[in-house]
A protein has these predicted regions:
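Juxta-kinase regulatory segment immediately upstream of eukaryotic protein kinase catalytic domains
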Residues: 1-27
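Conserved ATP-binding subdomain of kinase catalytic cores across diverse folds
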Residues: 25-174, 248-250, 261-262, 266-273, ...
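Active-site activation/catalytic loop segments of kinase-like enzymes and analogous catalytic loops
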Residues: 251-294, 311-330
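Amphipathic, Lys/Arg-enriched alpha-helical patches that create a basic surface
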Residues: 344-346
């Protein structure tokens, strides 16, 4: 995609119903690295908005993506209103274009969308306390519960086979067979570790195929910084970054949160002696999640959550190892062996 210029940003901003002229700057907002995210203000500084250019290299169907976002946020809004909540703070709100659409396509093929800015909130970048992790868990569980009656099969798959662990394993075997970089000989222990767990990769998909667990609307990127928290009360408000909302399993969202939150070191820590799984944080998260999501889940689905924690970690580690074998093309690396360190940490 072409770099965003100020004229392009202003042109995109002028395509949305912001209630008056807005002021733009090229200062990027937030910690995300996929989309281009900016804050725009009304000229009178009465209100601000999030304006984003969707990364169409990653999300090749931005129209389908926004159909997902609009459908899910409408559903959430209705649930929040019925419960007496505040839909302007408890879910994302899409700002329509001047023509009533959900995204604007610029002359270069760039896809833009806008949201109301949720004021008075923070995103946690790491787990600072048990209370923080519990708050994130409760918010994600509530998100799951509110969408439990949404027809998941109607959603577009924005990234094909994203959490298909068996397919990720197959890709690993292809990369290993090709060994295009000649790296396989140096990672025999890691290869054996993954291969010993091939059967595990099929467990959740087999349960789904057997009808033991249901297809759900899942977020699929449940890092703790994708939850907005009220900066005054500390209450979890809403889940953001809905680009990967797709049909999936509740175990995926539960497991990915555990993968990132219950590991007490950086994802790319090179010293493996520092890597530990905090079982107590797992228990804290599980209790918080089930306190808000549990009413809509069967016993079999609740039991599947532990498998989610195991498989999301295995899947991510396998993806890092696959990328290492293929020459580090997918994940950005900052040093030799970076993806190998990431794989080992998982």
């Amino acid at each position: 995609m072409k770099p965003v210029t100020l004229p392009l940003l202003q042109q995109a901003a002028n395509a949305f119903q912001f209630g008056g002229p807005v002021v733009c700057t090229l200062d990027h907002y937030g910690e995300g690295h996929i989309n281009d995210t900016y804050v725009v203000w009304r000229e009178d500084r009465s209100k601000r908005f999030i304006l984003q250019r969707i990364n169409t290299d990653t999300f090749t169907d931005p129209v389908g993506l926004m159909e997902n976002v609009c459908g899910v946020t409408r559903h959430l809004r209705a649930k929040i209103l019925a419960a007496g909540g505040d839909p302007m703070r408890e879910t994302l709100n899409v700002v329509p274009t001047l023509t009533g659409g959900s995204c604007y396509m610029d002359a270069d093929g760039g896809a833009w969308r806008a949201y109301d800015f949720v004021e008075g909130t923070v995103c946690l970048q790491q787990v600072g306390s048990e209370a923080d992790f519990c708050t994130v868990a409760e918010t994600l569980g509530r998100f799951q519960n509110q969408l439990s009656d949404y027809p998941a099969a109607t959603l577009h798959e924005t990234i094909a086979r994203f959490h298909d662990t068996a397919n990720r394993y197959a890709n690993f075997e292809k990369a290993l067979a090709a060994d295009s970089m000649g790296r396989a000989a140096g990672i025999a222990e890691e290869i054996a570790f993954v291969r010993a767990r091939e059967a595990d990769c099929h467990v959740l998909l087999d349960q789904l195929a057997a009808g033991e667990i249901p297809l759900r609307v899942t977020h699929n990127d449940t890092k703790i910084n994708n939850v907005l928290i009220d900066e005054t009360t500390g209450k979890g408000l809403c889940v953001i970054d809905l680009d990967t909302v797709m049909p999936g399993l509740s175990a995926y969202d539960f497991g990915d949160s555990i993968r990132t939150g219950a590991n007490d070191c950086a994802e790319d820590e090179p010293d493996q002696s520092k890597v530990h799984f905090d079982l107590h944080l797992y228990e804290v998260f599980a209790k918080g999640y089930l306190s808000t999501a549990g009413a809509s889940m069967s016993l079999a689905e609740k039991k599947s959550l532990a498998w989610g924690a195991r498989l999301m970690t295995l899947e991510c580690g396998t993806r890092f190892l696959t990328d290492y074998l293929e020459g580090d093309h997918y994940f950005h690396t900052a040093r030799p062996g970076h993806n190998l360190d990431r794989a080992r940490t998982q």
